[in-house]
UniProtKB/Swiss-Prot annotation:
PANTHER family: N-(5'-PHOSPHORIBOSYL)ANTHRANILATE ISOMERASE. It catalyses: N-(5-phospho-beta-D-ribosyl)anthranilate = 1-(2-carboxyphenylamino)-1-deoxy-D-ribulose 5-phosphate. The keyword Membrane does not apply. Belongs to the TrpF family. It comes from the Bacteria. The keyword Metal-binding does not apply. This is N-(5'-phosphoribosyl)anthranilate isomerase. It comes from Synechococcus elongatus (strain ATCC 33912 / PCC 7942 / FACHB-805) (Anacystis nidulans R2). InterPro entries: Aldolase_TIM (IPR013785), PRAI_dom (IPR001240), RibuloseP-bd_barrel (IPR011060), TrpF_fam (IPR044643). Its EC number is 5.3.1.24. It holds the Pfam family PRAI. Keywords: Amino-acid biosynthesis, Aromatic amino acid biosynthesis, Isomerase, Tryptophan biosynthesis. It is an enzyme of class 5 (isomerase).
Length: 217
């Protein structure tokens, strides 16, 4: 399987289609009301329907933080195919959503400050399908532009696939992937004009950089 490429924080159907055209394997929707990239279930449904027609194999990922069952149900009904838990969810929370939504990919995101956080990430492998490592920020859950210490992550080899996030850009992606070998990458602020408004030139530059360095398979 080739490198998964997730572009997160979209709000516009045409941008979603254009980014899928460029080669994204997953599109992320922020379901956290405090985020400037927030989209409602109705907005997600509109984008999901557009993607289903043009790119049915592209994953549609809902990003949540400490969500209720009702919130998750609303976005599942809107057409997402993966649940990304980006808050303070526990192992028990993950198992509960795993049992409730067995057909959906379950991703647990962790904001990494130290090697202890990497050990915590590995503890989730029994109850999720995929892990995601993001940079820590005291006030923000994601889309901060802060990068991780890639060298410190080299020993991270969980039994589940994992995605690298945290300040990735078209300019630094090949450096990151020369040091690490995640199953996929997740970009948001690094390919934006403003929160929720993606810059298609930057997304194009991302794919050009990956292709130039033989990182697309």
């Amino acid at each position: 399987m080739g490198l998964r490429i997730k572009i997160c924080g979209l709000r516009d159907p045409q941008q979603a289609i254009a980014i899928a055209d460029l080669g994204a394997t997953a599109i992320g929707f922020i379901a956290v009301r405090q985020s400037p990239r927030y989209v409602s279930p109705a907005q997600v449904a509109e984008i999901a329907q557009a993607l289903q027609k043009t790119h049915p194999t592209v994953n549609r990922v809902g990003v949540f933080a400490n969500a209720t069952a009702e919130e998750l149900e609303a976005y599942v009904a809107a057409g997402i195919t993966s649940l990304q838990l980006h808050g303070d969810e526990t192992l028990a929370d993950c198992q509960r959503w795993r049992d409730r939504f067995p057909a959906l990919e379950l991703i647990k995101a962790l904001r990494i400050r130290s090697t202890a956080d990497l050990a915590l990430a590995e503890s989730f492998t029994d109850c999720v399908d995929t892990l995601l490592l993001d940079a820590y920020h005291p006030q923000m859950l994601g889309g901060t532009g802060a990068t991780l210490d890639w060298q410190a992550l080299q020993a991270f080899q969980p039994s589940r696939p994992w995605l690298l996030a945290g300040g990735l850009t078209p300019e630094n992606i090949t450096t990151a992937l020369s040091q690490l070998h995640p199953a996929g990458i997740d970009l948001s602020s690094g390919v934006e004009r403003s929160p929720g408004d993606k810059d298609l030139e930057k997304v194009t530059a991302l794919f050009s950089s990956l292709a130039r360095n033989s990182l697309l398979k």
